[in-house]
Amino acid sequence: RESLLHEMYFSEKPRLAELTVRYEALRCDIMQQYYMNKDYDNVIRIATSLDIHDDADPNASCLVYYYKAQAYVKLENYPMAKEAFFREFELRKKYLGWEEEDTILACQNLGVLYSFCNEREEALACFREAYGHEVKKNGEDSEMAQKLLQYISVVES
């Protein structure tokens, strides 16, 4: 009897894993709807409870951290927002690389928050790093490169 239960469990395990991924994706969609409806407490509640594995779906994880960070910003909880933006940036850098424009944008977002919190050195480091990668990717005349130069100029002044 134990063998039969063991066999049933392991034969269903891939299906359970697939259902879990689908369920978590649905919860991500719900979290985004809460964000659009400005229900930031529920965004944070769902983002905190999601069981997403960074290595399985880095894009989904990055989105969760992004919306979580934005919700914390809207609620003016900047320390938690910094943590979430930093996590999003680190994941994008690790799994997607600097070739992805979203990685540069995540670095910029983190810099903006550092700047807002008067953490000038951290902000400058983010802006300069993002600028360097943006110039390599799209040249110094790109719109993003120009925006990053403006951020650097403002923080330096």
Summary of predicted features, one role per range:
Residues 1-157:
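Intrinsic-disorder-linked linear interaction elements in eukaryotic regulatory proteins
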